[in-house]
Design a protein with these regions (language model features):
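Conserved alpha/beta-domain cores
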Residues: 1-142, 148-150, 162-164
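Expand to "…catalyze enediolate/carbanion chemistry for C-C bond making/breaking, isomerization
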Residues: 148, 157, 161-168, 172
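Divalent-metal-activated hydrolytic enzyme cores
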Residues: 153-154
């Protein structure tokens, strides 16, 4: 979920045939590390971030797989692009050669009605043909059934597998 935490965990696994996904927030100042070390980014919600990733992806590496993060709830405090703006961001990303637009990612609010999942699924279907999308990432451990019913091809079920995440305390 966090770039620095991921990099620390990646180091001892260097050389293994693993595919690395960033599913957490991506700040502009972390794009170089992500462009150089990850295979997927699930949380692109601004053209500026997409352009930085594209510019910083090393030549010779496969294109970075990208999911556009959609703000499913419409809450200003949540990350993601508004559904009405997804097509424009998708077009901008699709034009960047070192990125490969793969699909959409959304995190509906806890307890969201199934209709919220269906709305994002419908948006994915609308854009699928135009952009060649193949990945819809909806749902987590608590709502994976609703997500799959809405067409999700990738669910984030870390809590169901590993349990609740432990909070890391600052030493200061």
């Amino acid at each position: 979920n966090y770039v620095q935490e991921a990099l620390d965990k990646m180091a001892p696994l260097a050389g293994l045939p693993l595919e690395w996904h960033l599913v957490g927030p991506l700040q502009s100042n972390k794009t170089r590390a992500v462009a150089e070390r990850f295979d997927w980014v699930h949380t692109v919600d601004r053209e500026k971030v997409a352009r930085r990733l594209a510019e910083q992806r090393p030549a010779g590496m496969a294109p970075l797989n990208v999911l556009v993060q959609v703000n499913a709830s419409g809450e200003a405090s949540k990350s993601g692009v508004a559904p009405a703006e997804v097509a424009a961001l998708a077009a901008a990303i699709a034009a960047l050669q070192s990125l490969r637009l793969r699909g959409l990612m959304a995190i509906p609010e806890p307890g969201a009605p199934r209709s919220r999942f269906r709305e994002i699924g419908a948006l994915f279907q609308d854009l699928r043909g135009e952009f060649g999308l193949d990945t819809l990432s909806l749902g987590m451990s608590d709502d994976m059934e609703a997500a799959i019913a809405a067409g999700s091809t990738l669910v984030r079920i870390g809590t169901a597998i590993f349990g609740e995440r432990r909070k890391v305390q600052d030493a200061a």
